[in-house]
Amino acid sequence: MAESDAAAPAKAKPAALRKGALVKVNRAAYSSSLEAGASDPTAPDYIFEGPGELLVVKGDYGQVRWNRPVPDVWLRMDQLEACS
């Protein structure tokens, strides 16, 4: 008798963000990150509200441009989510 390997259903991965996507920063992921520790103690609200445009994706990082007169920033892709 063959035992069935009933694995728990895998959690569906969110769609991968690509160049040109509108994104915002996930507050929970960012607040406990190395990037947050190296930045201002209080992050600006606009990064959590979005939208920012994903300009470049290199490995685990993405460059985001906000619709404001501020420099572009590099953030880990796991800290970004699609802006709805």
Curated annotation (Swiss-Prot):
HAMAP family: NDH1_NDH1O. NDH-1 can be composed of about 15 different subunits; different subcomplexes with different compositions have been identified which probably have different functions. The lineage of its organism: Bacteria, Bacillati, Cyanobacteriota, Cyanophyceae, Synechococcales. GO terms for molecular function: oxidoreductase activity, acting on NAD(P)H, quinone or similar compound as acceptor; quinone binding. Its main location: membrane. InterPro entries: NdhO. Its EC number is 7.1.1.-. This is NAD(P)H-quinone oxidoreductase subunit O. The gene is ndhO. NDH-1 shuttles electrons from an unknown electron donor, via FMN and iron-sulfur (Fe-S) centers, to quinones in the respiratory and/or the photosynthetic chain. The immediate electron acceptor for the enzyme in this species is believed to be plastoquinone. Couples the redox reaction to proton translocation, and thus conserves the redox energy in a proton gradient. Cyanobacterial NDH-1 also plays a role in inorganic carbon-concentration.
